[in-house]
């Protein structure tokens, strides 16, 4: 199972977590990892949900820097601006706080199958998603500060 997530902050608004899960089931031709199109679709969904331009600060995952992804970013420069975190700096990424909370919530969990794992993971992420103070804390722990433009 792979998860991609965006932790969204805007001064004066409730913090948001937007995510997608890919459960690998071993089907012929099925990708085990999230592809650049999965990330593209996540960005499009975020743009629709948030209803405004996005300034994205991304880690240096190779799929984030693939030529088709870069083309998508360039084509949507009217609503999408992308910066990258410095290399090897997970401590600056608020999403890492989300993954840490998720992992802690699943510490003693033993899934019976992939569907059970996906359902439980979604339930745990929804619990985080609906508690904006938890999402806010992920930004606070990075030491980064939001400044209104």
Regions found by a protein language model. Give the residues of each.
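Short functional hotspots at interaction and active-site rims
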Residues: 1-149
